[in-house]
Amino acid sequence: MTLARLKSVAGVRIPDTALCIAAVDLLESGSPKFLCTHCLRTYIFGSLAVRSLGGPVADEEAAFCAALLHDLGLIPPYRRDNRFEIDGADAARDFCTKHQVSPERAELVWRAIALHTSPGIAVRLAGEIALVHLGAGLDFLGLGLDQVPSQVLEEILEKYPRMKFKSQFRDLLVEHCQHNPAAQVLTWTDDVARIAGCTLHGQPIPTASQIMAAAPWDE
């Protein structure tokens, strides 16, 4: 996708190392275009958010790879039996290992992806981890959108359009939940699974309150 070959967007440099180019190629090879542009926006928004907080991102390459690959677990070739964040993190770490990234940096990428849906945790860790969390949160939920200047937002969306992201991403989440309903229990996607009619052992996906009430304790 030629959009990914831009040198910079909204004042954020797009890394063009061999590893970053390989990450783009991996993303493009099996992901729908709306997901590709989401991952690219995640990097731009996350970079701007971390910059505004004054936090450092020491490893730009690792941050870019984590942002680009953070939703791999939703794509059929990388789905296993875990919640999608873990499946995606595992796939990204395999990618890093294949490209001879050090174990420490591969672990950083893994954590950034595994924790990208963990409010209150990701922002307390390394800048690379916070970047993916903040960027994904802004693009998915609009968290911090009011802090993005209109001209900056316009440039980002011109370069990386949303392509009906909300509806298409929800459909992808539903498909993931239907593939593996057990992995959604006690995660933020459990309500998506319930609304989609997913069942576990013939019963609706339980809530946290139901699980606690059913625990084998008298009190």
Kindly label every feature range from the protein language model.
Residues 41-44, 83-98:
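An active-site-proximal "capping" alpha-helix that borders the catalytic cofactor pocket
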Residues 1-10, 28-36, 40, 44-56, ...:
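Divalent metal-dependent phosphate-bond-processing catalytic cores, especially two-metal-ion Mg2+/Mn2+ enzymes
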Residues 16-17:
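Low-complexity intrinsically disordered segments
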Residues 37, 58-60, 83, 87, ...:
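Alpha-helix N-cap and coil->helix boundary residues
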Residues 59-78, 84, 88, 92, ...:
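His-Asp-centered metal-binding catalytic motifs of divalent-metal-dependent phosphohydrolases/nucleases
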Residues 26, 30, 49, 72-75, ...:
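Alpha-helix C-capping/helix-to-loop hinge sites
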Residues 93, 98-109, 122:
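Internal catalytic or translocation cores that form aromatic/hydrophobic pockets or channels
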